[in-house]
């Protein structure tokens, strides 16, 4: 009997720990934004996100050439293959305007507005 109670408590503790870990993962995912590159232009060219929340930017490159999503202020740099998709994870940010560009095509520019 004592052994089965111990196993039950171990199971409850394990289930609770896994549930808490799952909640942390869900909270850490934050805001997901999507942007498309077509004809070497970002669409939309301005993204908006809440402050103090992790941000995930999904970039879909519809062009026939690769592109490099880059931002000095966001501290990110990601090469995305032609007709490919990439994901950039950004730390929590204070309110402000954070510019990004395609390093392979300097005319392609956009901004992340954090409020």
Locate predicted features:
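Beta-strand-rich interaction surfaces with strong enrichment in secreted/lumenal proteins
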Residues: 45-47, 75-79
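Asparagine-centered strand-capping/turn motif at beta-strand->loop junctions
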Residues: 59-61
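Bacterial N-terminal signal peptides that target proteins for export
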Residues: 2-13
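Structural beta-strand segments of beta-rich domains
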Residues: 45, 53-57
